[in-house]
């Protein structure tokens, strides 16, 4: 289905840097809880044996880190719970790192259709809002699928998406399961050589203005908007709690709060949380503490995940999971797999869109925001619904 597979490609558009992991010695894939538990141990052993690890973990894997949520993780689905390649090193000057242009005249994605029309969205929004009013949760990230057909070369399509919306945490994954094209602007976490872990939760979205003056006014409004700040602060507090489970007391810091990053179609509010990992923290312990990222669940995290499982029409799969790599020296970097398209061998393409719902959210505005976020994949094409 794709030449040079299996491989994983990472792309930081801000630094014009492409990193390729090709020809894995083996691939660790899990589709059941037993395979998942064994796979995490296999990944840890490979890491401690001096290997590089690159791949992804699906959103539903997060259910397996909490006994109460474990029954929600369906087994033996098309999309694995995780798939990681074991590599000797990143490939040097690999042909996959060379930009490739699409040769086809038709769009890479065709026939996009929202999984929910507005009436369906409103019903699920209203049920979620009832939970908010009852105090079951304070925020939940309600998402819906967009279905399409794909054709052509996924690698060329990946490069064409870069032109549409540059991001720092892009990735193309061709391991087991669907091919993943990820155009994520959000860092889940990174770890440096000294053991400092940092996460950049992204919560709060506004459309771009038509002029620089309009953009400046929109950014100023975002920074002063109590609803946007409240959404972001809830997730910052959640991640402070998550990250404290695996870090040294007294090292937790929030170096950036309510920053705004600008992309071709939207402005996003982002904050930074940082702390020092406890000595000898294992990979599985980091994921058990943090995964999935609180920005794509809600708060309180476990209750929000229960409510979302009840409301959403199917598994998120790779969407809202994490894609990244682990180096032998302990350096790690994973994105939050938002703006991520799953390509299946039969021509199906699926990507999800969503947003954080709080007490004063409005269904119409939230649905419009979902469709705005879908533009990363389909541009200005009409999305049927």
Regions found by a protein language model. Give the residues of each.
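Extended alpha-helical targeting/anchoring segments
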Residues: 1-385
């Amino acid at each position: 289905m794709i030449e040079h597979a299996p491989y994983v490609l990472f792309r930081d558009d801000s630094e014009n840097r492409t990193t390729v992991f090709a020809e894995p010695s083996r691939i660790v894939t899990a589709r059941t809880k037993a395979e998942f538990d064994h796979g995490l141990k296999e990944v840890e052993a490979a890491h401690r044996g001096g290997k590089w690890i690159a791949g992804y973990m699906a959103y539903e894997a997060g259910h397996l880190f909490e006994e109460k949520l474990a029954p929600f993780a369906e087994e033996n689905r098309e999309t694995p719970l995780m798939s990681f390649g074991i590599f000797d090193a990143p490939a040097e000057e690999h042909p996959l790192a060379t930009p490739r242009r699409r040769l086809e005249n038709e769009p890479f994605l065709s026939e996009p259709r929202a999984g929910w029309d507005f009436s369906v969205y409103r019903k699920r929004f209203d049920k979620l809002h009832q939970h908010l009013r009852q105090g079951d949760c304070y925020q939940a990230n309600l998402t819906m699928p967009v279905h399409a057909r794909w054709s052509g070369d996924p690698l060329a399509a990946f490069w064409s998406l870069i032109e549409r919306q540059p991001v720092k945490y892009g990735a193309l994954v061709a391991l087991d399961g669907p091919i993943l094209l990820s155009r994520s602007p959000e860092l889940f976490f990174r770890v440096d050589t000294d053991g400092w872990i940092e996460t950049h939760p992204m919560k709060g979205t506004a459309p771009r203005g038509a002029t620089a003056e309009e953009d400046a006014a929109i950014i100023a409004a975002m920074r002063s908007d109590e609803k946007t700040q409240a959404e972001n602060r809830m997730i910052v507090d959640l991640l402070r709690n998550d990250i404290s489970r695996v870090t040294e007391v007294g090292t937790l810091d929030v170096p950036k709060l309510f920053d705004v990053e600008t992309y071709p179609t939207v402005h996003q509010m982002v904050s930074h949380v940082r702390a020092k990992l406890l000595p000898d923290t294992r990979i599985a312990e980091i994921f058990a503490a943090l995964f999935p990222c609180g920005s794509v669940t809600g708060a309180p995290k476990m209750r929000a995940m229960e409510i979302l499982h009840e409301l959403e029409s199917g598994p998120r799969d790779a969407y809202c999971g994490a894609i990244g790599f682990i180096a032998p020296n302990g350096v790690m970097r994973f994105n939050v797999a938002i703006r991520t398209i799953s390509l299946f061998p039969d021509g199906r393409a699926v990507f999800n869109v969503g947003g954080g719902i709080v007490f004063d959210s409005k269904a119409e505005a939230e649905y419009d925001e979902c469709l705005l976020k879908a533009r990363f994949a389909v541009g200005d094409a009409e999305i049927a619904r």
